[in-house]
Amino acid sequence: MISIDSTAMKTNNFDLANLSQNDTALEIRNLDLRYGDKQALFNVSMKIPKKQVTAFIGPSGCGKSTLLRCINRMNDLVDNCHIDGEILLHGQNIYDKKIDVAALRRNVGMVFQRPNPFPKSIYENVVYGLRLQGINNRRELDEAAERSLRGAAIWDEVKDRLHDNAFGLSGGQQQRLVIARAIAIEPEVLLLDEPTSALDPISTLTIEELITELKTKYTVVIVTHNMQQAARVSDQTAFMYMGELVEYADTNTIFTTPKKRKTEDYITGRYG
């Protein structure tokens, strides 16, 4: 089994199957997804708690990133993608035809595997989303930039070079800048798709510490191939296999006393 420092883990008292509406950030109901004739997700249902870190784990191709991208409708951009089922945010199905997808993506931010800063200054990267919303007041932008860079634990490293090109930052700094850009528009939910897979161990540790801080303000959902990382940063973990949600429970249970044989086999390295 993966070794977990139980003294460092927050005890999760949530009954995930019966999570109250007040404690639920997102509810996924009977979600199926197909790319043409190929089905990638099969009847996935789960509730994701507010202001917690939920990790999706599983072998390559299991559907964890596909599921993550459903939460802010990034799969809309994929040809021949068809989705059945519901994802509820504030009790409303985000796949309802009346939903403003741009507004949804402002409320459900996403950070990808590789840092993707824009070819702009550090400052302009952070305030980009605010400018798109028509905010141009300099004081308001300055305050948002500092707040977001502090929130992404990078302010002290960049405060004296805000107008330098973002490409001059290290990989780890660029990823924190991208997180700052995502939280500048104050989303409720932050999706992280393998956010440290392209980073060195020191930068990875910094991002993991940041994730722990982010959950005080945001609901965080992370996809990771690194089981130790899931054990370190998440409050609950969902194990996926071949497009199905096999087991979903508090992280301590998943990594120490999983209920399903497939979960145990994956955690113990019998396949993956």
Curated annotation (Swiss-Prot):
Domain ABC transporter: 26-267
Reaction(s) the record says it catalyses: phosphate(out) + ATP + H2O = ADP + 2 phosphate(in) + H(+)
Any GO molecular function: ATPase-coupled phosphate ion transmembrane transporter activity
UniProt enzyme class: translocase
Gene3D superfamilies: P-loop containing nucleotide triphosphate hydrolases (3.40.50.300)
Alphabetized Pfam families for the sequence: ABC_tran (PF00005)
Major localization listed first in the record, in broad terms: membrane
Keyword Cytoplasm part of the UniProt annotation: no
Recorded superkingdom: Bacteria
Residue sites binding ATP per the record: 58-65
Membrane topology annotation: Peripheral membrane protein
A GO-annotated cellular component: plasma membrane
Function: Part of the ABC transporter complex PstSACB involved in phosphate import. Responsible for energy coupling to the transport system.
Protein name, as recorded: Phosphate import ATP-binding protein PstB
Upper lineage: Bacteria, Pseudomonadati, Pseudomonadota, Gammaproteobacteria, Alteromonadales
Protein encoded by which gene: pstB
